[in-house]
């Protein structure tokens, strides 16, 4: 069976029909250049925005400076140590409850940080291989106002501070082993010490002073014993006095020896806290004017302890002590 199919002839396309087969042509678009006025407007907006940001930053910095100005204050002074003039500075940071004292410069610089918040004092000497800490009473430093700063400046600036350096005063000797756990130290003390090993300072007195103190304690004990013997036997107390059952003994009230407490009484010594300072360690009770108080920081000699000198390599760390009358009147704002 034969299938018949109709053949459709292909139409010939002439030259006139080429434009119908060609792809559509894209019309040319003319880009209109930006006008100068538009560019000026954009530039003006950018400049105004930058000026506003700068103004806001300046205002913020001003208020930040004004706020921190009441918490931190620096003052510079001059001190005479062994006939040699040295520069010193004191920084009061009431916001962080810190005092920082610097003495000397270069290889003779000594820095002392009093952390009243945690009750720790850190001391470091330039070129030294150790950093030292000692116990410090906890206190609160009030804010320093503008009038107070002017008063401090008039009290210290441009004057040579007298130095009190008593030969019979206590001497601070470093411990034999460094502190293993320094987590109790503040960031300021850790920043002061850096990578140096930290050693506790233990107070000691010259042997002559210790001998005098032992003699005084021996006399007190002898006098107390004599009075007890005169009061009669223990079973028959004198009239008006309680018996031993109600009267506490001295040994019962005495605290046990604590080798980690640098302020503990040892060998009949009194408390090592400087009696010229008040209980907060900020000012001087008996002083009528400011002075520079220096203390000796020494290294252990490692020899026989009863030897007259069991320390070596002493260096001095000095700080300014203000009269308590001035401190209370000015710092606390009572006048």
Curated annotation (Swiss-Prot):
Cystine crosslinks: 131-193, 283-287, 284-324, 294-318, 298-314
SMART domains hit by this protein: BRICHOS
Family, similarity comment: Belongs to the chondromodulin-1 family.
Protein name: Leukocyte cell-derived chemotaxin 1
Residues of the BRICHOS domain: 104-201
Region (Disordered) location: 221-269
Propiece residue ranges: 211-214
PROSITE patterns recorded: BRICHOS
Source organism of this protein record: Bos taurus
Signal sequence extent: none
Keywords: Chondrogenesis, Cleavage on pair of basic residues, Developmental protein, Differentiation, Disulfide bond, Extracellular matrix, Glycoprotein, Membrane, Secreted, Transmembrane, Transmembrane helix
Glycosylation: residue positions: 223, 236, 244
PTM characteristics: After cleavage, the post-translationally modified ChM-I is secreted as a glycoprotein.
GO biological process: cartilage development; cell differentiation; negative regulation of angiogenesis; negative regulation of endothelial cell proliferation
The protein's role, per its UniProt record: Bifunctional growth regulator that stimulates the growth of cultured chondrocytes in the presence of basic fibroblast growth factor (FGF) but inhibits the growth of cultured vascular endothelial cells. May contribute to the rapid growth of cartilage and vascular invasion prior to the replacement of cartilage by bone during endochondral bone development. Inhibits in vitro tube formation and mobilization of endothelial cells. Plays a role as antiangiogenic factor in cardiac valves to suppress neovascularization.
Tissue: Nasal and articular cartilage, and fetal epiphysis.
Higher taxonomy: Eukaryota, Metazoa, Chordata, Craniata, Vertebrata
Classification via InterPro entries: BRICHOS_dom, Chondromodulin/Tenomodulin
Pfam families named among the record's database cross-references: BRICHOS
GO cellular component terms listed in the entry, alphabetical order: endomembrane system; extracellular region; membrane
Transmembrane segments: 45-65
